[in-house]
């Protein structure tokens, strides 16, 4: 996004930080379901949930070497989590993560736009309201 043409809140939705946070949210949601289904041990899920994180600089560094954004992201997350990270991304493709995370970002951006439209609607309905001005 071009910063000078973007509202700060909308820029945040499309930031690298939020993109990776959305990816992590998707990965954690899948791990949680696998745990509920008994496919990930509860102790490993607890470790994943408690330790999962990422470092954007590290992701960039790894991506420069492996030339794959999701592998770079997963490697960074694995460095935070440790051995239990073997369950992260289990049975998933890169598209599963990217597409779902994009949907989360689109929903967030859409909600923001709708809230802005609500303000415009309220302003418009009060446009002809008589007001008293003091000079």
What are these regions (language model features)?
Residues 1-127:
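A helix-coil-helix interface module used to build multimeric assemblies
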């Amino acid at each position: 996004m071009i910063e000078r043409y973007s509202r700060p809140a909308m820029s945040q939705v499309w930031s690298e930080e939020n993109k990776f946070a959305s990816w992590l949210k998707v990965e954690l949601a899948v791990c949680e379901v696998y745990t509920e289904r008994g496919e990930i041990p509860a102790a490993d899920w607890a470790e994943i949930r408690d330790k999962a994180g990422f470092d954007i600089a590290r992701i960039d560094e790894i991506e420069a070497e492996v030339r794959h954004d999701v592998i770079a992201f997963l490697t960074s997350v694995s460095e935070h989590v440790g051995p239990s990270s073997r369950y992260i991304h289990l049975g998933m493709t890169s598209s599963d993560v990217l597409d779902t995370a994009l949907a989360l970002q689109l929903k967030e951006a859409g909600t923001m736009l709708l809230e802005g439209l609500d303000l415009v609607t309220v302003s418009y309905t009060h446009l002809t309201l008589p007001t008293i001005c003091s000079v």
